[in-house]
Amino acid sequence: MKPLTVMTAHASAPPAEGGVAADFSAETWWLSLIKAVFIVAFLIVSVIMAIWTERRVLGRMQTRPGPNVNGFLGIPQLIADAAKLIMKEDFWLRGAEKFIYILAPVIAAFSAFMIYAVIPFGPQVSILGHSTPLQLTDFPVAALYVLAVTGFGVYGIILGGWSTHSTYPLLGAVRSAAQVISYELSMSLSMLTVFLASGTMSTSGIVAAQERVWWGLAMIPSLLIYVVSMVGEVNRLPFDLPEAEGELVAGHMVEYSSMKFAWYYLGEYINMFNVSAMCTTLFLGGWRSFVLASFWPGANSGWWPMLWFVAKVWAVMLFMIWTRATLVRIRYDHFMKLGWKFLIPVSLTWFVLVTVVRAYRAFSGGSTRVLLLVLAVVFLVAMTILFLLPDGGREEDRPEGASGADEDSEDDVVAPDEEFDAFADGFPVPPPPGQRLPPSPRTRRAAVATAAAGATTAPSSATSDQEGTDD
């Protein structure tokens, strides 16, 4: 048989380890409506519980009580916060782009609700006599739909920062755009490895492909890359650079109040549940219970799988809360270096290796799960060693007095006493029309020192002239 014929036959045949997508043949419009209402209610209630849980967990980790005064365990505090946001003054900026200023937080919030439409909560169940999967919808490229909606949601942040015509929100929006471009690349590459291993981009098909082993175990590098990228994707510590309080006050949300601010706040927490649900679907078996199914035949049937799915999602959520309590915000250049110089090259290399394994499986027809697991462990050890090796190009590793400039180039020589003025050209961004940045503290100190030196020099010159006259 010719090689081209063999390749065509393998391409047209179903994947050896691919999953089967959910069956929506018996779906009715009112079933879809019930599922949509359930998803919205589930996300809103989950956000309320996540805010309370985060406050309590952070309080415990920081050796303080947390909310515990208003009612039982401080739970009514959430009602007070919601009432405060609703009744706060809703001010409007005079120079803002009014339509986009209102539209931006709505885009950020409603795009977050759209992702759960393709997330499978469980298998086929019976609802009012109709057999239907616990999923609103699914299609062959559902995972790519998630990436598209995630990128669309960033427009809410970018437009919100630009429409205010203010410096801090604009800088936060620019940071958000750079952050999404940087970390969505590595996230997409980690997801592509799952598509290759599963043989499908359908979310329900990916869950079905993990019936025997989770991809988080068989492809540990993909899981680690996704976990780091998802924290950067949702702007959480240590990657919350677009809304860094110490630098940008609140980033793109500085000029928003009342319900417009609440839309951003709601969208941020829903996005945390979105990336947690995708992590569960892609790497943790989705609604399948790997341990309970080994001794309980009915663990992955009926309504029980929804409980396993929610438990996994909350486990990932608690991990993000844990990182917020234990890690500090990293520097922006270190953040970009981690994304472009480490995560993207590592994820691209791992993607190539998984592609080779997938091609081997397509031509041999055998199972490659053990091969993937061994390759993942070896690759993880190699990348850990490379990551821990000292970087000779870092400034702190150079000997004292050394410079990174070329010794033979006279243009690179910088005077040791010359100070760099970061605010010389309107750093960090040019000020809006009609505004001027105040002089930096260094500039003010230099001006005071120059004036003091001039005042000291003038009496000295007068004294010298007087002594010359007396002689």
Residue ranges and their predicted role:
Residues 2-471:
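Selective transmembrane helix interface/packing segments
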